[in-house]
Amino acid sequence: MPSCYEHSAQSPRPLSVLAEYFPKGYSVFYKANTETCPEANQYSKALVDFYTQELNQAEDTNLTLGQMGLGDGVSLLLLWQSLLQCRKNNPELSRLKVHLLIFEPHAISALELKQLWQALGLFDANSPVAPQAEQFIAGKMAQINGAQRFILEQGQLRIDVHFGDLHSNLTELMTPEHRVTHWHCLPHIAHTQTEFAETQASQLQFNQVQSNANQLNQAILWQMGRLSQDNASLYLDGENFKPSASDNNALTDCTLIKMATQAGFSRYSPNLFQASSDSCNAIPLGERRALRQQQENRQAHCPVPNSLGERRQAVNNSDSIAIIGGGIAGACLALSLAERGKAVTLYCKDDKLGDGATGNRQGAIYPLLTPENSHLSQFFQQAFLFSRRRLLALLHEVYPIGHQLCGVLQTGFDERSEARLEKIIQGQHWPEEIAYAVSPEQASALAGVSIDKPGFYYPNGGWICPFEFARACLEKAKSLANVEVKLNSTISCIKPLAANVDSKDASGCTSQASGTLWGLYHQGEIVGSHQQVVLASGASITAFEQTQALQMSGFRGQVSHVPSKGELAKLNTVICANGYLTPAFNSTHCVGASYVKDPEHLDFCSDEQAENGQKMQQSFPNLEWPQDIDVSDRNARVGVRMVTRDHFPMMGCAPDIEEIISRYQTLNASPQASQNNYAKQCQQYWQQTPAPVHHNLFVLGGLGSRGLSSAPLAAECLAAQLCGEIAPISATTLALLNPNRMWMRKLLKGKALC
């Protein structure tokens, strides 16, 4: 009987079981021999024709499509193929950016999806979508709840796959400016499939989701409507939506049409892609607006750029967005903005990029997990996978980035840490693509050196050279849009400028933008002016008047560089125990790091160097290879990482803390403050009143020790918000990332601020 730490390889669910989940006839790919699958060929041709029509008729440079159900995933490949063909046939579509939102109640891994696609012949030499299929599978889609974003074709195709409860995932998305134009509903989402759920649940190991949450219902359709344009279409496949005679719970065509009409979808069809009337009913459209306003009221304490409460101020692609900071956060944001065609000016105080905390030679990349799989844990799983995709995309274009996706082995190093790790392992049925428990023997085989205790292994983790990653992001950004990097450019102060005052932007041109501009200063001299400014300056992010109260602290970290020799040279995975140790890179390992709050200096410290040399010996006192860690040559690097108490990064609008405190004091000084229900009224005020912010000033920081894992997704979400798009994280997570969260938590609970 294996112990709880011994790993037994999990095989993907049998193809026969997966095929039973996806209704017969759904596999839509047109095979080479159409006689063997004429229905699939007809379906896929109609789907490609539909996608081609919608792509060619797109009225904006941004086209957002929704899909209820992932199914066997072939439909996303057909959209991808259609986009490539349309761009080839119509050069004017080169600027079109397509965003596909997929909502699927039953999670499926990349390994299982690969198994399905292999059975369909999608990887065959004569398959027109083989390159796309291979690229998507390499993205390591995992069986986790929430969104997983895939950025493809130089940012021209973004696919968000949302696994989990349909209604919850839809409800948790903030209403965007760029709303869904068309919805495509796959057959298995229309059926309750009660009998199937009862007989196959144990085999499929699906999340225990109620049957009626897995199908279209009125509540789900209303949330789809909230996210949609007024004239958005809802397409249904009539043949596959027809319930069997034995299924009394399945939805009928008439029921679907009625529900779609009530939710305000102007065009729908029980027959494949045959659109009906374009007329819009004022009543359901009014209901949609009410739903949007309700969400806005619920989330008022968490201001989002370009939301209903903070009306979008037109920013042309030619108007440069300023990013202050040349580390991993600023570089990732520049890339995400460039993929959207935005001009960027990045100010870096150093003479080279990535010279702060990003300057370490090797940094571990793996998710932070908690026993209860909290929002923090879910965010880091999403972020880790997205960061990995970013890395692979840059490597595919031959950008030089030192890295090794060699896995990460986590072990305890004392009784407390061992108990904590065991609690994490036992807390959830973790997807194998995220992490799995290993015995000491298995850990030793993975690490290449002897490990005498069990551990938790992250197979898709590893290490990345942070500064090379950051520089590659910026080089890629420069190839996509007007991105300028200004080195040796210290910004010590930012002040609002009146719009009617002639001021030069970063390119030396007089800005014509309406509204307030931000002036960037150093030693009293203006360096530039921009309509939108993002502070992503790492350890100096709280050096500005507007951000000095942000609740994050600087921690010094000294990482020691040790020569690769002896048994240590055999190490081939990252070890995280009391500190971390990397495999060799250019004949040198990294071990560390120290953790000193509010450091007085960043000079080399002999004591910290010695402590680093002891970390692995303390973790594995009975083993010999840690003795090969030699720190005597005083080779090390020191940086400061900004850490928040709750371990979430800070991303979003810069809060106006003075105004928050002023309003708080005014409310407390009110004559009604002594009334019994006044505290509840104050809580309601803070819940529903837009929280004060510095308009068009944003924060991206507080990445702590896991910036390599969290920065790319946090930057992508901020870029999406700045451009009025749907971000790939929930409203709840956005609130947890918001820089004002420490104050809002107290105010929403009726607690005193000080």
Swiss-Prot record:
Q: Where in the cell is it found?
A: Cytoplasm
Q: Where is this region: FAD-dependent cmnm(5)s(2)U34 oxidoreductase?
A: 324-754
Q: Does the keyword Cell membrane apply?
A: no
**MF terms in GO:** flavin adenine dinucleotide binding; oxidoreductase activity, acting on the CH-NH group of donors; tRNA (5-methylaminomethyl-2-thiouridylate)(34)-methyltransferase activity
GO biological process, any: methylation
Tell me which UniProt keywords the record has, alphabetically: Cytoplasm, FAD, Flavoprotein, Methyltransferase, Multifunctional enzyme, Oxidoreductase, S-adenosyl-L-methionine, Transferase, tRNA processing
Per the record, which residues fall in region tRNA (mnm(5)s(2)U34)-methyltransferase?
1-320
User: HAMAP family given for it?
Assistant: MnmC
Give the family this protein belongs to, as stated in its UniProt record: In the N-terminal section; belongs to the methyltransferase superfamily. tRNA (mnm(5)s(2)U34)-methyltransferase family.
UniProt xrefs under NCBIfam families:
MnmC_Cterm
- Give the PANTHER family listed for this entry: SARCOSINE DEHYDROGENASE-RELATED, TRNA 5-METHYLAMINOMETHYL-2-THIOURIDINE BIOSYNTHESIS BIFUNCTIONAL PROTEIN MNMC
Name listed for the protein in its UniProt record: tRNA 5-methylaminomethyl-2-thiouridine biosynthesis bifunctional protein MnmC
Q: Which organism is it from?
A: Shewanella denitrificans (strain OS217 / ATCC BAA-1090 / DSM 15013)
